Amino acid sequence: MEKTSFSHDTNKVFLIAGMQWGDEGKGKAVVTFSEKVDIVAKYNGGHNAGHEIILNGQQYKLHLIPGGVMHPHVINVLGHGMVIHLESLLKEMEILTQHGIEVLERLRISDRAHILLNAHVDIDRKMEHRRMSGGGKIGTTLRGIGPCYSTKSARTGIRMGDLLHWEHFSKKVRDFYKIHCDFENFEELAQEEVENHKKLYDIFAKCICDTGYFMSESIKAGKKILLEGSNGSLLDIDMGTYPFVTSSTTLACGAYLGLGVPLNAPIYRIGILKCYQTRVGMGPFPTEFFDDNYTHIQKDGTEIGVSTARVRRCGWLDLVAARYIQRLNCFNSIYFTKMDVLTGLKEIKICIDYRNKVDGTILERGRFPSTIASLEEYEPVYQSFAGWDQDISQISEYNELPETARKYIEFVEKEVGAHFQWVGVGQDVKSIIVRS
């Protein structure tokens, strides 16, 4: 295992991405690392994803706005790989402003990012209702993300740059409703959408720019830049647990695709891995449990979705999935989060392999089943570890952790094959252990 420790001085452009089904603790990591950067840029997703951040005892919830907004010197970029519901962006911005956090002057929105219309939300609800009646519910957040990416691929979507040419934008909105909305009053709804976006245009027009060029020039100028991924790698549209995935590229390569970062840019990649597994909504979950361990993890980990308020499903850490995601992303270092949540468990299990239920063969390490049907052919193989009772939330030195906690961390580190440089031991952004 190569040990390449991260340094703000050496690694001026770096990336943070989740290694599971989201909710790994990326928001806390972004706020921690963005204190010393000039720019934080998001490259995928929309207001379906959420970060819950606790800074100096105050709780903040972010969906569209990058975590760098918590630091007054940081420019925050929404890249062209995102789909942006401007009304939700405004609401989020207003809440931050109430807490004394200025956003607008430090916000850059890609002119190539797609606008998520209210029509996309209506389409999403109708599609999920049809799937539910057919027994094929996906568990979408019902925020229009999938339909917006769909119209992007169908080349009927509307981009931020269109908003800067008002007559052109108004026509595109009306054409969009005519093509995609089977409502009797679609013309009236289209007009409402246009009028709503006129107000939003007045607020956000000055933020819309060529962010790809901005990013390239910033890299050339030697700016310190954090690239922020939404959702988690197991939700990637191509490599995740399809169809129970999101509609964008959530892997590290998405930073190049969704921000226009030059392909020769030296990006240091940081993976965020939670010490247990969680999932929101439908989809396969091989290591899920329903016993007292669930009660402990769900309660102590506050495992409730930031965007949907849905209670998260919980399970043991899945190393089959983690090794697979590490193979795809090649993270240089990993931030291992929420170790404090495991405190009090007598026994902690880790899934180390998948075993075929019929012939007992073990799935090759680094692989992950490509379909739900093939995944169901396997069962998890567990290895057990002793737990600990000591409160670790105030510990700042690695060697002060209980020996059993260190054994757990070091086993996972060896199996994943990347340096675990940071360990999260509490909710606050300052509750972190840095390993040499």
Swiss-Prot record:
Provide the cofactor list for this protein: Mg(2+)
Write the Enzyme Commission number(s) for this entry.
6.3.4.4
**What Gene3D superfamilies does its record include?**
Adenylosuccinate Synthetase, subunit A, domain 1, Adenylosuccinate Synthetase, subunit A, domain 2, Adenylosuccinate Synthetase, subunit A, domain 3
Q: Which residues of the sequence carry a binding annotation for GTP? A: 22-28, 50-52, 312, 338-340, 424-426
Look up keyword Nucleotide-binding and say if it applies.
yes
**Membrane-spanning intervals of the chain:** none
Query: What is catalyzed by this enzyme?
Result: IMP + L-aspartate + GTP = N(6)-(1,2-dicarboxyethyl)-AMP + GDP + phosphate + 2 H(+)
Recorded GO cellular component terms are: cytoplasm
| UniProt cross-references to SUPFAM superfamilies, sorted A to Z | P-loop containing nucleoside triphosphate hydrolases
Q: For binding IMP, which residues are annotated in this chain's numbering?
A: 23-26, 48-51, 141, 155, 231, 246, 310
Query: Which subcellular locations apply to this protein?
Result: Cytoplasm
Answer whether the UniProt record assigns the keyword Metal-binding to this protein: yes
UniProt keyword terms in alphabetical order = Cytoplasm, GTP-binding, Ligase, Magnesium, Metal-binding, Nucleotide-binding, Purine biosynthesis
InterPro entries in the record, alphabetically? Adenylosuccin_syn_GTP-bd, Adenylosuccin_syn_Lys_AS, Adenylosuccinate_synth_dom1, Adenylosuccinate_synth_dom2, Adenylosuccinate_synth_dom3, Adenylosuccinate_synthetase, P-loop_NTPase
UniProt binding sites for substrate = 306-312
Q: Which residues bind Mg(2+)?
A: 23, 50
Q: Which GO terms describe its biological process?
A: 'de novo' AMP biosynthetic process; IMP metabolic process
What PROSITE patterns does the entry give?
A: ADENYLOSUCCIN_SYN_1, ADENYLOSUCCIN_SYN_2
> How many cofactor units bind, and how?
Binds 1 Mg(2+) ion per subunit.
Assign the protein's first listed, main location to one coarse class. cytoplasm
Q: Which family does it belong to?
A: Belongs to the adenylosuccinate synthetase family.
Query: NCBIfam families, per this entry?
Result: PRK01117.1, purA
Summarize the protein's role: Plays an important role in the salvage pathway for purine nucleotide biosynthesis. Catalyzes the first committed step in the biosynthesis of AMP from IMP.
Q: How does it assemble?
A: Homodimer.
| Further remark | Parasitic protozoa lack the de novo purine biosynthesis pathway and rely exclusively on the salvage pathway for their purine nucleotide requirements.
Protein name, UniProt field? Adenylosuccinate synthetase
Q: Which organism is it from?
A: Babesia bovis
